[in-house]
């Protein structure tokens, strides 16, 4: 799992070239989840955890050796080193909701905010109306922070909010009294879960700081994207020059380091969430996720997020980087806001001029001098032009020349290294779009598609002495560059809860320019361009900060609804949004959820699909949680209704029907947050072959009526099993268009897998 700055799909973003080397411990770490706290006193909560372990292990010494963390603020539970049989024994205790094995999570700019319309240019802009996020606190759970970055300076900041109960922890090369300020108001680190599971990290192989300081830069990049201060004249290898800032430059940032050398222990992440809830964050941002989709009740971040959301804290989290394959989406709990990644209207065209005077525009992040004209070669037998064979079969014909190769799969750094080691001067790589550009000032590496690669190959074979010139990359932005869902972005449908649409929303996550640790191999003056849903997540978190500033009384689900129902389904220029992959197609809700985030529209959505904890309880009932389990989660006696509710009635800003056979009726409720006296009419764009009827077709709101419910009757005309078809349901008052995606699959034969 060792990759570097190609930003490949294995990580949510690639930030360092490491291989974890741990000493394997005998016992494993398990999280014993007990639900809502029974005591307000944290010490009493911890004592109850010790007593439970004592009943199993038999001595105080064994308890102290076993316990890793006590979760005692946002919820109750503990992490402990247990054998498999001990974990089974403790899971059978009546007060235990779930015993969850420890999981390793992977860590998944100047132009971004202007592209989305979040500009400080006028007094009526979202940024100005929200006072740039001032007095809001965002918690970032990631790999730490590089506090010296100017993006975290506190010039112009007032006092830290009085409600803040957190603080800063000193550690290796991190002095709390020096490195924290009125902007960076919190910094803590959590590593005990990782160490308890795998032993002490080998810091010779995996350099790290035992403190909140960020070694690799992932967390620094994320935090500065959310709320970095204004910093003029920033560029990256001379490209993308402009004023760098986060989405909410006035926000207070609290950093919780739970990720080490690219990996995050679930026990550590859960402890970070517990502390953040206690400290008083208003929003949580997590650019991380499991390598495979997990059920919410066995997934650490989902457990922590449930309690955060129940306390009014929105949780924004990455969709994952396992795309473009279907059903790869992770972080699928209905109470979190799951973010996919798109490109933005910026690219870096790089001119390739052949000896026949034909110029091809590839893509690169190359800030070096012009190269050429020099020789151009295509490695024939035994390489057959395959990029992946270059390193295994060094070829002397590459010396002093630019090499053309074709990549059948996601390319690796080995191809670039092979050309450099053979004395090559540059590399032109024909491949499927992966948004994996290596920044460089010395060695030009240019990406093109297979069609353009074939054109170059024809030229090479048409002349005895092919030559080529490669110019430095340029920055191009505006309507001539279309928006696409990134190839790496994980896709729906949701394999864990198919009736819950995931992702929820998309945001720019390709070549995002933000602050970085100087240790990073891609650092250029304290900044770097990175790609991944890790980078898209803080873009959405920044918007959530601004919405929270303007609407402090809105619930997490209200904020999610406002974002989803106002999203662009075309890009800001009005052009269609495509989804990159092995073949390019028009994007659909499984690629981008409600669409591309539209911050200015989200401020005034008109109507919202709101939810409370009671709605999530109905979800738990619908997916067969027991009354006892739900009661433990909530800390109060709860009985599911009989008959059990339908998951289709969960008041989400989307409708997803995975197994339609005949007809189904579902319900939604909307709350008016726009003009008091409003009349909305429904507009239906049904999926192909699907009939959709809404009753009533008109919703009237006034001073006494702020909520209205409606039913949606859905039936199919298909006579065979189909794939998903997509449409939309929109309420409009001619000023607001409140749109939700509709996704329907007909299943005449139930639970049938068709390989044809």
From Swiss-Prot:
Keywords: Autocatalytic cleavage, Glycoprotein, Hydrolase, Protease, Secreted, Serine protease, Signal, Zymogen. GO terms for biological process: proteolysis. It is found in: Secreted. Its EC number is 3.4.21.-. It holds the Pfam family Peptidase_S8. Residues 29-106 form the Inhibitor I9 domain. Glycans are attached at residues 175, 202, 233, 357, 395, 519. InterPro entries: Peptidase_S8/S53_dom (IPR000209), Peptidase_S8/S53_dom_sf (IPR036852), Peptidase_S8_His-AS (IPR022398), Peptidase_S8_Ser-AS (IPR023828), Peptidase_S8_subtilisin-rel (IPR015500), Peptidases_S8_3 (IPR034197), S8pro/Inhibitor_I9 (IPR010259), S8pro/Inhibitor_I9_sf (IPR037045). Belongs to the peptidase S8 family. This is Subtilisin-like protease SBT3.9. It comes from Arabidopsis thaliana. The lineage of its organism: Eukaryota, Viridiplantae, Streptophyta, Embryophyta, Tracheophyta.
């Amino acid at each position: 799992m060792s990759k570097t700055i190609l930003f490949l799909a294995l990580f949510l973003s690639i930030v360092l070239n490491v291989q974890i080397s741990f000493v394997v411990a005998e016992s494993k770490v398990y999280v014993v989840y007990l639900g809502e706290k029974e005591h307000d006193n944290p010490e009493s909560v911890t004592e109850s955890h010790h007593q439970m372990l004592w009943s199993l292990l038999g001595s105080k010494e064994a308890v102290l050796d076993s316990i890793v963390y006590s979760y005692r603020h946002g919820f109750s539970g503990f992490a402990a080193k247990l054998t498999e049989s001990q974990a089974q024994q403790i899971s059978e205790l009546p007060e235990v909701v779930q015993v969850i094995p420890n999981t390793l999570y992977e860590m998944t700019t100047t132009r971004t905010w202007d592209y989305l319309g979040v500009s400080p240019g006028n007094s009526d802009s979202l940024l100005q109306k929200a006072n740039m996020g001032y007095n809001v606190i965002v918690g970032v759970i990631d790999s730490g922070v590089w506090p010296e970055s100017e993006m975290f300076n506190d010039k112009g900041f007032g006092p830290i909010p009085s409600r803040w109960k957190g603080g800063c922890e000193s550690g290796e090369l991190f002095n709390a009294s020096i490195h924290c300020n009125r902007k960076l108001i919190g910094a803590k680190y959590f590593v005990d879960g990782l160490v308890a599971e795998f032993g002490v990290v080998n810091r010779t192989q995996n350099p790290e700081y035992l403190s909140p300081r960020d070694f690799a830069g992932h967390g620094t990049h994320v935090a500065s994207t959310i709320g970095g201060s204004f910093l003029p004249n920033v560029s990256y290898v001379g490209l993308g020059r402009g004023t760098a800032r986060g989405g909410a430059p006035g926000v207070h940032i609290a950093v919780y380091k739970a990720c080490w050398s690219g990996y995050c222990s679930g026990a550590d992440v859960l402890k970070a969430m517990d502390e953040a809830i206690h400290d008083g964050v208003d929003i949580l941002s997590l650019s991380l996720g499991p390598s495979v989709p997990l059920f919410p009740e066995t997934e650490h971040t989902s457990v922590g997020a449930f309690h955060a959301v129940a306390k009014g804290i929105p949780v924004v989290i990455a969709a994952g980087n396992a795309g473009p394959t279907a059903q790869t989406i992770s972080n699928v709990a209905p109470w979190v806001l799951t973010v996919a990644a798109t490109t933005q209207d910026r690219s870096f065209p790089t001119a390739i001029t052949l000896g026949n005077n034909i110029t091809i525009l590839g893509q690169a992040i190359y800030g070096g001098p012009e190269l050429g004209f020099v020789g151009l070669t295509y490695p024939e037998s035994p390489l057959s032009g395959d990029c992946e064979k270059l390193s295994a079969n060094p070829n002397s014909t590459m010396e002093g020349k630019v090499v053309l190769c074709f990549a059948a799969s996601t390319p690796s750094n080995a191809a670039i290294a092979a050309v450099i080691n053979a004395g090559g001067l540059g590399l032109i790589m024909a491949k499927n779009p992966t948004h994996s550009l290596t920044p460089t000032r010395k060695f030009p590496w240019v990406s093109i598609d297979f069609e353009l690669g074939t054109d170059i190959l024809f030229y090479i074979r048409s002349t005895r002495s092919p030559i080529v010139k490669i110019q430095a990359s340029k920055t191009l932005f505006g309507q001539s560059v279309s928006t696409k869902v990134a190839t790496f972005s994980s896709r729906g449908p949701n394999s864990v809860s198919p009736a819950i649409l995931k992702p929820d929303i998309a945001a720019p996550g390709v070549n995002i320019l933000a602050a970085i640790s100087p240790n990073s191999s891609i650092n250029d003056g304290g900044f770097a361009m990175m790609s991944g849903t890790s980078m898209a997540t803080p873009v959405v978190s920044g918007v959530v900060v601004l919405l929270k500033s303007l609407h402090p009384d809105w619930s997490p689900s209200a904020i999610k609804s406002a974002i989803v129902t106002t999203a662009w389904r075309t890009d800001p220029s009005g052009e269609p949004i495509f989804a990159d992959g092995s073949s390019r197609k028009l994007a659909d809700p499984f690629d981008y959820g409600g669409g591309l985030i539209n911050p200015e529209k989200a401020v005034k959505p008109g109507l919202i699909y709101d939810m409370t904890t009671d709605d999530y309880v109905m979800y738990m009932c619908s997916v067969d949680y027991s009354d006892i389990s739900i009661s433990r989660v909530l800390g109060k006696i709860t009985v599911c209704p009989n008959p059990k509710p339908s998951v289709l009635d969960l008041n989400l800003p989307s409708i997803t029907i995975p197994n339609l056979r005949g007809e189904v009726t579902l319900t939604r409720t909307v709350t008016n947050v726009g003009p008091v006296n409003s009349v909305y009419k429904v507009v239906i764009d049904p999926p192909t072959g699907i009939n959709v009827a809404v009753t009533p077709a008109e919703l009237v709101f006034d001073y006494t009526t702020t909520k209205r419910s409606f039913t949606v009757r859905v039936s199919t005309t298909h006579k065979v099993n189909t794939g998903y078809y997509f449409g939309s349901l929109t309420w409009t008052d001619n000023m607001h268009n409140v749109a939700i995606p509709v996704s329907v699959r007909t299943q005449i034969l139930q639970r049938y897998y068709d390989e044809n």
